Amino acid sequence: LCFSGAYTKPQVKKLLTGKATRNEKLALSVIFGAFGIAGTYLGVPVQNAIANSRVVGVALGGILGGPMVGFAAGVIAGGHRFLIDIGGFTAISCGVATVAEGLLGGILYAKLKRKPFDPFAALITGCAVEVVQMAIILLLSRPFEAAVSLVHIIAFPMIVVNSIGLAIF
């Protein structure tokens, strides 16, 4: 509902047409970062980590607003994720992954610019950014065995649910 409501805002309409000012993009970065934070809190605790939908807000910010919006939203939501669990098993990896997901959403935006929103491209982007997140968890989280166990449990549901979430928005 929050995402649907965002579409009615003039700033989001400007973002979709490529006419948003720098200040409007900054404000929208905060909004999409807040959506990412909400995705963290709506997540489910799994093995000292959080299976979440943080990527939907962050990647969507990148898809709709480009790399600057995606990156900034990723820094906001990823920084929050790190700060709520400093020293946690996945704090660093999930924080880094969130920034990467925003940037990847922004890269897709560059491909879609001045074209209608493409749900299939958003679905593929969702799959790609979630795979990147799982890879970052495996690369940065320790102990490695715990990271493998976590990814084994959360990868499929997070890839499917978050990809569909991006596509239907």
Feature map (PLM): residue ranges:
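Short helix-coil transition sites and intra-membrane helix breaks within transmembrane domains
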Residues: V46-A51
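Transmembrane helix-bundle signature of multi-pass membrane transporters/permeases
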Residues: L123-C127, I154-I159
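Membrane-water interface of alpha-helical transmembrane segments
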Residues: K19-L26, V148, H152, M158
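Non-cytosolic membrane-interface motifs at loop->transmembrane helix junctions
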Residues: S53-G57, T90-S93, A147-F156
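Short helix-perturbing small/polar motifs within transmembrane alpha-helices
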Residues: L1-T40, L60-R142, L166-A167
